[in-house]
Amino acid sequence: MIQNREEKRMEQNQNIQIVQYKEQSIEIIQASNPSEVDWKKLDTKLTTWVIVSGFFSEAELAPLSNYFSFHPLIIEGVFQKKARPAFEEFDDGLFITSNCVNLDEEGDLADIPVFFYLTDHVLISFLGQQCAFFEPIIAKLKNGKPRLKKMKADYLLNLLLDYQVDHYLLLIESLGEKIEIIQDGILEEADSKDIQAIQHMRYVLYNFLRVVWPMREMINLFVMDDSDFISDGVKHFYRDIHSHL
């Protein structure tokens, strides 16, 4: 069967990483498809982070979703291309929708839904494209002190959400620098390009706030919720995330 270019492109952008760790060790498994992983052989005594990057079909995700007994709403949720930050608790886990934001090549805001599914010892993250967004967190686990790897999956979720919020703040700083450049140009000699630049920045900032405020609301509700999947010793870290937004 001959694949079209779009199918080949999607396959090239698919990736599965499984990070398993405990206080003194860490192991990373790489795969291009969930069917390549023998899920039953995962050590359930270790904290496990499954990173799903790229676009997979429901059939391709079946080995993963079946092993972790995903609720149908979770399967439906991870295929959303646009999603408002939210969380929902199920019997077996906590499902969280968030957004990764960046500026594209044209300077417009690009927001990509990021989904998390948290169980007692497992965190699964879904990012709709293959990129190195979470690589700094993987590096932190590799190089971090044993105390960091001693923490469980609920703390790992905190690290990832906090990293996303830090990324928001860096983007705000970048937008601020762009605004200063535009303002300096206007002070010297305003022209039609400066007016267009201001209008574009207003558009970008408006879209940015449309992403950030729902994220802030979600984290606030998340902090107030008494979830069984977030331990008491970790809850204050989530409060810190909310205070940064």
Give the residues covered by each predicted segment:
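Peripheral, non-transmembrane regulatory/ligand-interaction domains of membrane transport proteins
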Residues: 1-244
